[in-house]
Each structure stands twice: as C-alpha cells, then as structure tokens.
C-alpha cells in the first residue's frame, strides 16, 4: 500500500532521527571511555605523587637528623622532680638536666639510656637498652620440661633450693614479715653427673620465671673488657625481664682464685670475675633476680665469690647412695617395657659409687642390649650387662692418655 506524501516524509524523518541518535550514543560511549582512561591515569599519577611525597618527607626527616648536632648518651640515676632528672654521663660525671616537653617524665626510669642535646644537655630522647645479641641468645625461650618428680635421691637438695630460689619469688611477703633479707644466690657443687643442671632446669619450670642460662666459658673473651661488658649486659637483661633466674654453669672457669702472677689472659678472666662480684653486690635481692651457680671444683673458687651476701647458700650434691640409686632407676625405667620380676634393688646394689648420670646410662644401655637382640622388652640380664659395661673399672680406665694412645 502506497503512502501519501506527508506520511512518507514523517517516516523518512523518523529514520533520520534514529540514525542520528545512534551516532551521538556511539560518540558518548567513546568519550566516556576516554574519560575513564583519563581518570585512571589521574588516579595512577596521584598515587605516584603520594609515594614521591612520602619519600620526600622521609628524606627531609633523614636530612634533619643528619643536620642535628650529636647527642650525649647517658644513664638515668633518678628523677629529681617533674622537670629535672639526674643523669650519669661517662666519663664526664653526673648532671641534673631538664626534660624536653615531648618526653613523659613517667617513662624516665632509673637505669634507662637517654640522649642529651649537645648544646643544652636537655633530655630529648629515651633510648632502648643496649644488649649484645650473644647475651640475648642466653635467654631460654621455652620453659624446660624437667620437674621435681623427675629427680631422684635429691629430696634434701630440692628442699633447700626451694627455700632460697622459689620461695622468695612466689612469697616475698614472708621475708618482709620476718624482717630478713632475701637470699641472692645459691651455689650447687658436687661431682659430675649428680643432677646440678637438672635441678636448675626444674627450678626454672616450677617458678615460671625468665630463665637465663650461661656457661662460664662463654664469658671468657679474647678482647680486653668484653667479658665484663657481657656480664653487665647479662644483668641488665635480667632486670628487664624480672622475675628472672640466671644459671651460671661451670662457674669455676671465671671464678677461680686470684694469684699474684699470671698472664694477660688470666688478668682478663679476673676482670670478668670482678665485674660479676660488682653486679652481685649492686643489684637488690628484692628485684626478683636470683643467681644459681654450678661447679665441680668448689675448692678452686675465689673466697670473695663464696662469701654470704653474694652466695647465701651452698648445696652439696654427693654421689647417690643405694636408696637414691634405686629411686633414679625407678624414674628412668618408668616408661621402659620391662619383663616381670626385674629386681631394681639388686641392680642398684651392683653400682656402688655411681653418679645419677651413670645410673641413667645403665637404663639406656639395657635398652640397647634388648634392641640389639630384636626384642621389645628389657630383661634382668640386660640390666646386669649394662651395669658391667657402664661401671667397668679395670686397669685400662686408670691409664694415662699417653699410654692409652700408644
């Protein structure tokens, strides 16, 4: 059907309007894509600008620090009032200095390291305490799993060390009520293998204190003054983590008696011991810092180290008697798969003069004999052969090294 002239014109105008609309819509989409792209570029540039501004700010702060005058490092003695502090600066001496308004006076505690301005001696920064990484490694992170129940034949020693170490830490009010000073330290001495280190680990387990273990040989350094510095930092770390226990094993390596003569190495060891004596006199017993020392040679220790006030109690660890050896055998054979009828008392009688470590070694050797014969249980014969192996005292054992290696 043919359309009239006006209708035909309206149809053509509608088609033209529809095409024009599609054209403008496509243009709008293109422009929108361009706007989105430019917006994304703008955001990226803003992020880069913020990053560069942060770098500039850090560089300005670093430049300001580099342009600042140097500071003196001192140690706080005590606070005089709300605005003044007594500070010890080595080697100049002690000074009463002002505290910067940005520093809270409550944060300025005795023995903390601070920075003083070079021109006015104003305290403007609190510094962290300086501790050698080697000293930090001496702190035992994991609490030892040894308990008093794992120690046999040392009931008297356990009671004494509880009175000196555990009781002051858990119940200091008892000593205040009696009006007596808390003990500072204890010395464990006796032959090797009698349980000194084991008892120290059990004390650390039951007191729930920071346990710092150090061997005396670790404090012997080749450079002058290094050993004394490590001793100072050891006690600084103990004060920071109080309540704490410092266990010094093999103390005879630095605590031997002083002689008139001696080489340079001996004088350095003596210097380390003098610093240890100074620290034992310097820190207060009420600060919850206890010292446990262990040695096999109490006869060579310096008398200045053993006097009361430094070492308040000396606990002897003798070789276990028959009953003690029986208790140790029961403890170490508790988890072993034993056959019925094993007479542990007879085994204890076969080991006169044996140490606790040797008794434990007998249990281990008995298990090795059973393992060698592909058995899953240990017999009385295994224990007897283990005793014969561990306790053999023939003539070869007493030979000198020179004869032994000929």
UniProtKB/Swiss-Prot annotation:
Residues recorded with modification Phosphoserine: 120
Region: May mediate interaction with PRPF9; residue ranges are: 186-406
**Is GTP-binding one of the keywords?**
no
What happens when you mutate residue 60 to Q? In a colorectal cancer sample; somatic mutation
SUPFAM superfamilies reported in the protein's UniProt record: P-loop containing nucleoside triphosphate hydrolases
Residues noted as binding ATP in the record, renumbered to the chain: 190-197
List the subcellular locations. Answer: Cytoplasm; Nucleus
A Gene Ontology annotation in the biological process aspect, one of them, is: negative regulation of programmed cell death
Q: Which keywords label this protein?
A: Acetylation, ATP-binding, Cytoplasm, Nucleotide-binding, Nucleus, Phosphoprotein, Proteasome
Question: What family, per the record?
Answer: Belongs to the AAA ATPase family.
- Give the quaternary structure: Component of the 19S proteasome regulatory particle complex. The 26S proteasome consists of a 20S core particle (CP) and two 19S regulatory subunits (RP). The regulatory particle is made of a lid composed of 9 subunits, a base containing 6 ATPases including PSMC5 and few additional components. Component of a complex with USP49 and RUVBL1. Interacts with PRPF19. Interacts with TRIM5. Interacts with NDC80. Interacts with PAAF1. Interacts, in vitro, with the thyroid hormone receptor (in a thyroid hormone T3-dependent manner) and with retinoid X receptor (RXR). Interacts with ERCC6.
This protein's name:
26S proteasome regulatory subunit 8
Q: Which organism is it from?
A: Homo sapiens (Human)
Tell me the classification of the organism that encodes this protein: Eukaryota, Metazoa, Chordata, Craniata, Vertebrata
The gene is: PSMC5
